[in-house]
UniProtKB/Swiss-Prot annotation:
It is found in: Cytoplasm. Its main location: cytoplasm. This is Leucine--tRNA ligase. SUPFAM superfamilies: Anticodon-binding domain of a subclass of class I aminoacyl-tRNA synthetases, Nucleotidylyl transferase, ValRS/IleRS/LeuRS editing domain. HAMAP family: Leu_tRNA_synth_B.
Amino acid sequence: MAYPFSTIEPKWQKYWEENKTFKTVEDKNYPKDKRLYILDMFPYPSGDGLHVGHPEGYTATDIYSRFLRMSGYNVLHPMGFDSFGLPAENYAIKTGIHPLITTRKNMETFRKQIKSIGLSYDWDREISTSEESYYKWTQWIFLQLFKKGLAYEKEAPINWCPSCLTGLANEEVKDGKCERCGAQIQRKNLRQWILKITEYAERLLEDLDELDWPESIKIMQKNWIGKSTGAEVDFALVDKDGKETGQKIKVYTTRPDTIFGATYMVLAPEHELVKSITTSNQEKAVAAYIEEAAKKSDLERTDLAKNKTGVFTGAYAINPLTEQKIPVWISDYILISYGTGAIMAVPAHDERDFEFAAQFNLPKIKVVAGAEEWESGKRDFSEEPKACTTEDGYSVNSKQFDGLKTEEAKTKITEHLENLGIAKRAVNYKLRDWIFSRQRYWGEPIPLVHCPSCGIVPLNEHDLPLTLPQVESYAPTGTGESPLAAIDSWVNTKCPKCGKEAKRETNTMPQWAGSCWYYLRFIDPHNNEAFADKEKCDYWMPVDLYVGGTEHAVLHLLYARFWHKVLYDLGLVSTKEPFTRLINQGMITSFAYMRKNKSLVPVDKVKKISETEFEDIETGEKLEQVIAKMSKSLKNVINPDDIIKEYGADTLRLYEMFLGPLEVSKPWNTSGIMGVFRFLEKIWNLSDREIYKTPVNDTSTPETKTLTVLLNKTIKKVTEDTASLNFNTAISQMMIFINEVSKHKKIPHYVWYNFVKLLNPYAPHLAEELWQKMGNDESIAYSHWPMFVEKFCVDQTCTVVVQVNGKLRGKFEAEAGTSKEELERLALSNEGAIRNIEGKEIKKIITVPDKLVNIVVQ
């Protein structure tokens, strides 16, 4: 009989919605260890809707949540939308339609698609970051950051996207290009709001060790934070006669042991001392260089492959340990944002310094000898090195520190510099403060005003939310001002402090702002008095399992950790970290077709010749089938709506989980869906067989014993695999179970009853229908998860090897624990043994219970 998924699935989706089956309340009867918060990274509601990659993570958390509910847990499993962002604004610029209208329309599409997959979210907790009732609290949290001194205004060189016409955080730039649109980034000085994430660098680093996250993500965050230890050293500037001027250049170095090899210094073009130390005859060249450097992104400036450029300032400093006068240069390979924006250049032991010295014919002094070189007895290192060496070794050309190993030399030389009063130990981070403002319309307004008398003043909290005004044009100005700056009626306001004329801040917050804390709003989404009730936060937090893509490693995940720690310091949350466990689902890829020149051909331009042969329809060129990311341009995006229409949501759910382990990327192959559909169809048809009553775990007949053993093994396997998120192997075991059960014309009630429960998290629509078909009035969603009996999970039979004089002659099956005498009898009656002992005298029989019988003959 055909499996009527198109009738069953809407029926149960309607039932769940009308009965609020998955509504969650803070029931204090559940102890803390029986409350679990399972969260998906919420989607941006684009106009394209879902593709089959989205349901992978959503289905995984849904299976796990359904399993946990049946296992006696109170589960919080919500869904919402990260709805501020550039795509909706760009669409508004083209069409004139307000972003809120398109965003709400897109959310409706997403909501409909998500519900059609049968995901057990508590929809009463739905949130949207662009709704005023939500961003009121995003603004409120920003004000707490501002009052705590963690938000400051500064004119700074930023990453400017000439296409999006807005500033970007460092984390939003990939390979010198805008992460969103791919345009080449420019550098531009703009007034910005910046958050002091660097104040939390050490805690963000240390607390990673407490998290059950993929090691690769932790490493990415550690590298981004980039902690290093070293020393800050002062180099005195001198005039042309070698007399100290009173000015000093402070450098940060991780290699104080190499200071004897510092032969010149380099300042970032933006360094505050450049103007004052540049000599008159170098002013023109220095000014031209600074102007050129300002046009480059940090990535361009630090590209290891580019030729080193620079200009001599005309100034000199004194190396404090060699007492030699060394020139001071400026170069764009030094960034003002790292360390002190100045370096002591040691060309013999730093590749960039070596290249710069070679370019400008500056001296190189070797001060570290390799272990092999030193241990060979060589002591003359006066010759200028022809190559740079960066590995540790022994100090040379370093006066009293010669012969010290690198680590000891670092310590001793730092102590010596400290004793001279010109250095101190220091820790540095690559992490930069977060450029928080955007020069766009569709984002949270920053709740501050600029008052001529009072300066920057926060809005009163009772005046939140500060809402976005209606505008005629959503287009960014391109001048660095937000479109909001043109709305005089909105910009002009009264100072909350003195009541005089003032102007609103016109920059808006980045898309990341709303997603920094959304997991907290899910806990208490309708609270008008606080972002979330503290008691409810204590009930649910931290998030026990967070599932999403690796692309958020140093953006959302780092920002959310930062905001959470601020809220923790303010006493507003009780946990130091928001997300205890993180899993990154693998990408679902698709097939693409590649020409010899490595370019890809859209799927609709490909002709399939055979399972392994493909050609370009237009040119006839043979094509290679490859795995690639789904993309609209390649026409290989799969819409889940199409799959659900043809095969059903349960088929989609099972297929995506059956493709392979959750964390591994795997290719979508529509032809593979049919096997999963037939599996569900087989289950449906089995439900029409006779289901008869018999004692639970009946072993009174060979048939019931076989099914009892199979059921208990299946319960154990599916339980363990679901608990460990190994969904593909759990499905495989259920397939084995159904294949065996289908051999039986009638099925014991307890066997079918418990299997339907196992099926429920994976194929909930079908499970609900089968559950009702068995006479149950309530939903299966909160029925008790089946328990297995361990004795039935141990193999009941074993394979016994038969040997004659130590050589394998046969095998037979026997029940585990069969007596020695019975094993010998069975071995002697084995055909292989009979052939090899005929006409011979049996001297002895050696038996290893459950394993082998060796017949010794002569």
